[in-house]
């Protein structure tokens, strides 16, 4: 497989791809964008959710994210065009969790389709080869979804950047015209390049593709997972330029509807976190619908309630929907949040092919923004309250 030099990442000819696959080359350019959400394009913004959602789960936060997005669908806040699920990385036991998407469609009364991602990073020329078409189908499906959308759509990335990066390389003109913004939940928010050299998990999945996201011809809302990626003596920590927060699950799960509690119980039941309490038959049974509509497993939920849940991506979903969170955890339209828990600040940022970022504040930037916590002490409680509000909206 040929690895393109970073400088050539977005310079590959699009014309050849258009001729092979009938991809139209749009002549429209990206409009100047201030630090406003993708919802500026329509009263009901469109969203594509790209996630590493697996069963058995890698980390249950992805299932909380999925429920958050579908809560916005149920409340008619967004038009969710598709859920794109990463190809499982090498050594991972799970498969793309289409069962979880089916459950959320059932709960929200929606019919959102699923796209599965590419098993390896390809350059556009390789993606054009007939033998690789199936492997690159996720990127092509993403392009077709953008193309068919009646308005520009935002893309949230909470896992690997591979498929979005490839799609952007295949048709940058389409991204300029139809991508309202990318919400990139990955990386370290430190401006210190030496500290950023320890790669955060999502970056490590595909550093070259992560770097390419910073070059896309559309607005970028960068939500680093941590200010400094954990490792060695560095622990998980709430910080100004990191989205990380956590909560005790018993503070949230009992407040949810029975079906939503069953949705979470089903993923716990089939994941590592509750494996010791499950028979192999129970852990593998694909009875997603009957389980969803069945009685609660009180003992399972009580066990899981005693565990903490790490979270990262909530702020980006809300911002894409035109919503914000106040310092006390209230969810409201962005313009009405007087004391926000976080903001997106304009920056100048670059990222090398090794996945290491450098950035600095830039008040003149109109299309690159970084997440910033306004009050580190109050942020975890505010985000937990906001997440709870969203999840409680689901029936």
Give names to the regions the model predicted.
Residues 41-82, 87-96, 124-236:
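Active-site histidine-anchored catalytic micro-motif
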